[in-house]
A protein has these predicted regions:
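Conserved helix-loop functional segments at active or binding sites
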Residues: 53, 229, 266-270, 355, ...
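Active-site loops and adjacent core secondary-structure elements that bind or stabilize anionic groups
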Residues: 1-201, 216-234
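Gly-rich Lys/Arg/Thr-decorated short loops/hinges at beta-loop-alpha junctions or inter-strand turns
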Residues: 23-35, 111-117, 193-210, 287-309, ...
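Substrate-contacting helices/loops that form the catalytic groove of nucleic-acid
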Residues: 177-212, 270-282, 286-291
Length: 394
């Protein structure tokens, strides 16, 4: 297949639309089900690069959950804990025996379930039955993987009444070293982003604390690889091999940090027993529970707790999750890693990161205020590496 006709481009009025190879060669993909759209393919090709990079860097299967050409979550295939199984809504499945790939997708989808609603999934490995069963129960636009077991493909083909988008990509495909993009009739050309993120990139530790654990190195690499394929400006919080908060596409660095930090806080607040034990009605769907939890742990909690409102969601009225209770729980969050796609211009980013349990930071460095940023890291005993490499993505 040398080209694939699309229903339309970014929007329904943008016609005609297609994907094709400029050199008239075969496309590196097969569409096994559905009819993917323009944005689906943007998500798929960016996500595929992300998960293959993650697998190469860690040796573990990887998955990502993309929305609007940025990852809402991404993870490598580490086993789930009982608490994570509960907050990712997989505790009713045989989660203790999940394949590593299924664990990776459960983590990627679970990082920010509000943003992942209607995601496009990328998988580093052949999609197995466990992973397909996870995908089947979520609201999702499609998936790309290097292959599918017969059982997994049959499960996915039943989704959306047979219209779920399933793409198989040639895992041996290597793009040309130069890439092109056209904007307003003008063609842009640049070398493809082929930077390899490895331990050597993390070796320039500029803080007093230089104790970088193997787990922290892994999480630093995970954060930087995620940022490599996230719309800039971007900041990513990572813990235990998975994104727990991605702040994408903000013009201000500190707003990236605040956004990612708030998402990381929400991820951790979901694990508090007060949230885990919310008395949901049996008829409330997972998506509705996600929405209710998001409001409950936020500042507008009375939107779900007011009389006449709580009865729609809960069997009994939950207690308010007070600001002091939330702060006390968040103070238990530790050993979080933070990556940034460009330098921190002010130390306010570090102050905000500290509130979300950040101990390890990877950023390019190069700000005129690097000394102030380092000083703030030292105040909190953080470990910070200057990579010397910017990771803008547009």
């Amino acid at each position: 297949m040398k080209e694939f006709e699309l229903k339309y481009g970014c929007n329904p009025n943008q016609k005609p639309a297609k994907i094709y190879m400029a050199d008239n060669s075969e496309l590196p993909i097969k569409v096994l089900s559905g009819r993917p759209g323009y944005i689906n393919f943007l998500d798929a090709f960016n996500g595929w690069q992300l998960v293959t990079n993650l697998k190469k860097a860690t040796g573990l299967p990887a998955a990502t959950s993309f929305k609007h050409v940025s990852p809402a979550g991404a993870a490598v295939g580490l086993p789930l804990t009982e608490t994570l199984a509960k907050i990712y809504w997989v505790d009713d499945m045989d989660w203790k025996n999940f394949s590593p790939l299924a664990c990776a997708y459960a983590r990627a989808r679970g990082a920010d379930r509000m943003s992942s609603f209607g995601d496009f999934i990328s998988l580093s490995d052949v999609c197995d039955k466990d992973t397909a069963m996870l995908i089947k129960r979520e609201v999702s636009d499609g998936v790309i993987a290097p292959g599918y077991t017969e059982e997994a493909l049959e499960i996915l083909k039943q989704k959306k009444k047979g219209n779920y988008n399933v793409i198989q990509i040639d895992e041996d495909y290597v793009p040309a070293p130069l890439e092109h993009k056209e904007v307003f009739g003008v063609t842009f050309e640049q070398g493809r982003q082929e930077l390899v993120i490895d331990d050597e990139m993390l070796s320039n530790i500029v803080t007093e604390n230089k104790e970088l654990t193997e787990e922290a190195k892994r999480d630093m690499k995970v954060s930087l690889i995620i940022l490599k394929y996230t719309q800039s400006n971007s900041v990513c919080f990572v813990k235990d091999g998975q994104a727990i908060g991605v702040g994408a596409g903000q013009q201000s660095r500190v707003h990236c940090t605040r956004l990612a930090g708030q998402k990381a806080d929400n991820w951790f607040l979901r694990q508090c027993p007060k949230v885990l034990n919310l008395p949901f009605k049996d008829t409330i769907s997972r998506a509705e529970r996600d929405n209710a939890i998001d409001v409950y742990i936020g500042d507008e909690y009375m939107d779900v707790l007011a009389d006449g409102m709580w009865e729609k969601t809960f069997t009994e009225k939950p207690e308010v999750f007070t600001k002091d209770e939330k702060r006390a729980w968040l103070d238990q969050m530790t050993d979080v890693t933070l990556g940034s796609d460009a330098f921190f211009p002010f130390s306010d980013n570090i102050e905000r990161a500290h509130k979300s349990g950040v101990k390890y930071i990877a950023q390019p460095g190069g700000s005129v205020r690097d000394d102030a940023v380092i000083e703030t890291c030292n105040k909190y005993g953080m470990v910070m590496s200057f990579t010397g490499i910017r990771l803008f993505h547009h």
